[in-house]
């Protein structure tokens, strides 16, 4: 059988580590070197780390301040918006009340104007009816008078002869002459 370390030839050349235990040789364990490196890192790294932490702290504080300012601005804008909303609601209520009263007033004015117009139309109708009645009565009177005159003229023409006609004219002339003398 082959040796297990054959595929890893480098492992065969390493010496084995020995047992676990404390090495009391200070220079062999490098605690001094490690403490020096750690001390140098703490001494010089403390400033860099402190600067990084201070920068981070300043950024966080600046962000908090900006957030507070934004919050205060948002609260102020909210209060202004609420005040404007209340004002607009008040105006809307006033317009609504005034609008309703204006609508009622316009409605009453319209109703009154319609009644006035209806009364005027009724008066015009009555006047037109009265005028038409008077015209019809006048036409009937004229017609009756015309027929009466035609009838009287027909009667007179049939009854009168020249002698009666001359006597009537003479009598009328005599009456006019007497009236003329009285007036003088």
UniProtKB/Swiss-Prot annotation:
It comes from Lotus japonicus. Keywords: ATP synthesis, ATP-binding, CF(0), Chloroplast, Hydrogen ion transport, Ion transport, Membrane, Nucleotide-binding, Plastid, Thylakoid, Transmembrane, Transmembrane helix, Transport. It is found in: Plastid, Chloroplast thylakoid membrane. Belongs to the ATPase B chain family. This is ATP synthase subunit b, chloroplastic. GO terms for molecular function: ATP binding; proton-transporting ATP synthase activity, rotational mechanism. It is a single-pass membrane protein. F-type ATPases have 2 components, F(1) - the catalytic core - and F(0) - the membrane proton channel. F(1) has five subunits: alpha(3), beta(3), gamma(1), delta(1), epsilon(1). F(0) has four main subunits: a(1), b(1), b'(1) and c(10-14). The alpha and beta chains form an alternating ring which encloses part of the gamma chain. F(1) is attached to F(0) by a central stalk formed by the gamma and epsilon chains, while a peripheral stalk is formed by the delta, b and b' chains. The keyword Cytoplasm does not apply. In plastids the F-type ATPase is also known as CF(1)CF(0). PANTHER family: ATP SYNTHASE SUBUNIT B, CHLOROPLASTIC. GO terms for cellular component: chloroplast thylakoid membrane; proton-transporting ATP synthase complex. The gene is atpF. F(1)F(0) ATP synthase produces ATP from ADP in the presence of a proton or sodium gradient. F-type ATPases consist of two structural domains, F(1) containing the extramembraneous catalytic core and F(0) containing the membrane proton channel, linked together by a central stalk and a peripheral stalk. During catalysis, ATP synthesis in the catalytic domain of F(1) is coupled via a rotary mechanism of the central stalk subunits to proton translocation. The chain crosses the membrane at residues 27-49.
């Amino acid at each position: 059988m082959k040796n297990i370390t054959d595929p890893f030839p480098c492992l065969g050349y390493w010496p084995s580590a020995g047992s676990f235990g404390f090495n009391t040789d200070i220079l062999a364990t490098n605690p001094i070197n490690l403490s020096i490196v750690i001390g140098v890192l703490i001494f010089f790294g403390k400033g860099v780390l402190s600067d990084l932490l201070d920068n981070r702290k300043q950024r966080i504080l600046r962000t908090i301040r900006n957030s507070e300012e934004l919050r205060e601005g948002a609260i102020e804008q909210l209060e202004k918006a609420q005040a404007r909303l209340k004002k607009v609601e008040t105006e809307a209520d006033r317009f609504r009340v005034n609008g309703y009263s204006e609508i009622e007033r316009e409605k009453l004015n319209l109703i009154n104007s319609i009644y006035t117009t209806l009364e005027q139309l009724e008066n015009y109708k009555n006047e037109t009816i009265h005028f038409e009645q008077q015209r019809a009565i006048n036409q009937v009177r004229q017609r009756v008078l015309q027929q009466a005159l035609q009838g009287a003229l027909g009667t007179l023409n049939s009854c009168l002869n020249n002698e009666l006609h001359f006597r009537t004219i003479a009598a009328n002339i005599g009456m006019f002459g007497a009236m003329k003398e009285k007036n003088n």
